[in-house]
């Protein structure tokens, strides 16, 4: 059986010391590639680019797309002005991810968003975000943990009979969070299941 090629949206990392200062590097978190390998896929890192032809040609070879984490999504993309607690934004990365989404949807391949990736998908589909969790009066759980990423710190309830519940084999999950934003309005065609 052919292993699926899963593209991962890449970001850019700048060195901060020595000969690496201002030397941009394409990267993704190692957890993304390892998780895809453990699930039986082949991870393909998609380097940041503004070249739409390269984006389309790359996605044409993929069986699925993982939108990775990173900067906050630029609020003007969802019709809001930046508020005081907005983090660092990178509008060019937003456009890169939007182009990946467009190409993936045209090919009708599965898309999975983690952290910023889920937020980008929501904004791409016309949804909006809380620029900081402090602006959401219903948020009571601590989402910006001061723990190691491997330590589960709060429970997530998952709706029965959803792809997510089927994939993990249960309806609750103890996880960690390192977020300061969340979905405000859900984008077209999307459904909150956890």
State what each model feature region is:
Residues 1-112, 123-124, 130, 134-174, ...:
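N-terminal beta1-alpha1 cap of cysteine-dependent amidohydrolase-like domains
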Residues 115:
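Conserved G/P- and acidic residue-centered "switch" motifs that form tight phosphate/ATP-binding loops
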Residues 118-121:
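Hydrophobic, aromatic-enriched interface-forming segments
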């Amino acid at each position: 059986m052919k292993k699926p090629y899963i593209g991962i949206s890449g970001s850019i990392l700048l060195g901060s010391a020595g000969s690496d200062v201002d030397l941009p590097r394409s990267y993704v978190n190692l957890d993304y590639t390892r998780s895809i390998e453990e699930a039986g896929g082949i991870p393909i890192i998609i380097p940041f680019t503004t070249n739409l032809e390269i984006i389309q040609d790359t996605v044409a070879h993929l069986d699925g797309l993982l939108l990775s984490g990173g900067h906050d999504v630029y609020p003007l993309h969802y019709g809001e002005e930046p508020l005081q607690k907005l983090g660092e934004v990178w509008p060019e990365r937003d456009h890169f991810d939007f182009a990946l989404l467009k190409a993936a949807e045209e090919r009708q391949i599965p898309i999975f968003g983690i952290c910023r990736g889920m937020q980008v998908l929501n904004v791409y589909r016309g949804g909006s975000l809380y620029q900081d969790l402090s602006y959401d009066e219903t948020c009571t759980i601590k989402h910006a943990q001061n723990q190691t990423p491997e330590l589960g710190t709060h429970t997530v309830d998952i709706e029965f009979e959803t792809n997510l519940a089927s994939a993990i084999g249960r309806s609750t999950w103890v996880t960690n969070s390192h977020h300061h934003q969340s979905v405000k309005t859900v984008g077209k065609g999307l459904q909150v299941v956890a």
